[in-house]
Amino acid sequence: MEVDNVKPSSSVPQRNWEKENNVQNVDSIFEYNNKQQVEIRNAKPWDKDPHYFKQIKISAIALLKMTMHAKRGGNLEIMGLLQGRIDANSFIILDVFALPVEGTETRVNAQAQAYEYMTVYSEMCDTEGRKEKVVGWYHSHPGYGCWLSGIDVSTQTLNQKFQEPWVAIVIDPLRTMSAGKVDIGAFRTYPEGYRPPDDVPSEYQSIPLAKIEDFGVHCKRYYSLDVSFFKSQLDAHILTSLWNSYWISTLSSSPLFSNVEFLNNQIQDINQKLSAVDKKLQLNDRSVDGHEALMKVVTDAKAVGDELETGRISHLVKQLLFARQAGGGCGCSHASAGSPMDIAVATEPEKAGPSPSAPEPAVEMADA
């Protein structure tokens, strides 16, 4: 059942976040059966069926920890490990912990320090009586979606070979901030030499033009798992404590300002894709591929427009709220030097100002 019976201590934003991400309230999922886990690991059913694992269930605490970690990383990739267990055809993720790694905008490198930290942390968990095993890893793709790159595929394949069962999670913190819902995906790679059957086309996701080639080359070497989220009444206090630090940063920031570079990159990417589609249609205006590519660009543009409008509304609401609080809380026009509506209207000329001439060089790059 979905989270409807929430404790009074939960704030309204926290309840909205849980419902937006469809967090379910389940207590029995936390029960650990050691005998069952040993039997499953000894049987190794995933060796016989490359598509054995079909879904992953993530606790709300683990989800919030990963989201906060990825958000702190900003434009740099981050990495951490997943703790949990397996149950039939599912991974159950109960907790996560971050790794001290060296990240760039396109990759993350785990050095000796990270491996040492990983070993010590796991040993401390065993000492404290925590029975959950490390069953996978997570990392971020800032601004370019949830999928596995060539390096990710190699890393996941290696881990599945020597540390099964193992799963990979990818989070996009920039798209999460823009959309308001956690952008997340979970993946497993196929064994070497295995050719997957032609499946039904998956749901379209926007991939930057610079990443499309990497995405296309490796997209048949892995598959995605259905992702769901859960929580229990026992971890409500921990979730509330985490949320108290999460909502402050969310409330004090705006995607219109914190995601300026990401939004500009999205607009430039759409411009480049339109230039490529225009060339394709000029050669053959009845090209099916050209029209399909055009519809995908339209989908991307609509998504960017929706994110901008959502960010604008959120920003105006915060201005109205805090201008009223600063004026003494009565909400009257005389309460402050400028009424909330005056402040909101004052921001419009800034938004209507001349936009940067970023599309021009993007067209030249596409023509080149």
Swiss-Prot record:
Predominant location category: cytoplasm
Subcellular location(s) of the protein: Cytoplasm; Nucleus
UniProt-annotated stretches for the region Disordered: 347-368
GO cellular component: A band; COP9 signalosome; cytoplasm; nucleus
Requisite cofactors: a divalent metal cation
Keyword Secreted: no
MPN domain ranges (all copies): 56-193
Renumbered ranges of motif JAMM motif: 139-152
A Pfam family that the UniProt record links to this protein: JAB
EC number, as in UniProt: 3.4.-.-
InterPro entries, sorted: CSN5_C (IPR040961), JAMM/MPN+_dom (IPR000555), JAMM_MPN+_peptidase_M67A (IPR050242), MPN (IPR037518)
UniProtKB keywords: Cytoplasm, Developmental protein, Differentiation, Hydrolase, Metal-binding, Metalloprotease, Nucleus, Oogenesis, Protease, Signalosome, Zinc
Keyword Cytoplasm in record: yes
GO biological process entries: cell cycle switching; gonad development; oogenesis; protein deneddylation; proteolysis; regulation of cell cycle; regulation of oogenesis; reproductive process
An MF annotation (GO) of this entry: DEAD/H-box RNA helicase binding
Binding-site positions, Zn(2+): 139, 141, 152
Entry comment, domain topic: The JAMM motif is essential for the protease activity of the CSN complex resulting in deneddylation of cullins. It constitutes the catalytic center of the complex.
Protein function: Probable protease subunit of the COP9 signalosome complex (CSN), a complex involved in various cellular and developmental processes. The CSN complex is an essential regulator of the ubiquitin (Ubl) conjugation pathway by mediating the deneddylation of the cullin subunits of the SCF-type E3 ligase complexes, leading to decrease the Ubl ligase activity of SCF. In the complex, it probably acts as the catalytic center that mediates the cleavage of Nedd8 from cullins. It however has no metalloprotease activity by itself and requires the other subunits of the CSN complex.
Subunit structure and binding partners: Component of the CSN complex, probably composed of csn-1, csn-2, csn-3, csn-4, csn-5, csn-6 and csn-7. Within the complex it probably interacts directly with csn-1. Interacts with glh-1 and glh-3. Interacts with lag-1. Interacts with kgb-1.
Family assignment from sequence similarity: Belongs to the peptidase M67A family. CSN5 subfamily.
Protein name per its UniProtKB record: COP9 signalosome complex subunit 5
Species this chain originates from: Caenorhabditis elegans
The gene coding this protein: csn-5
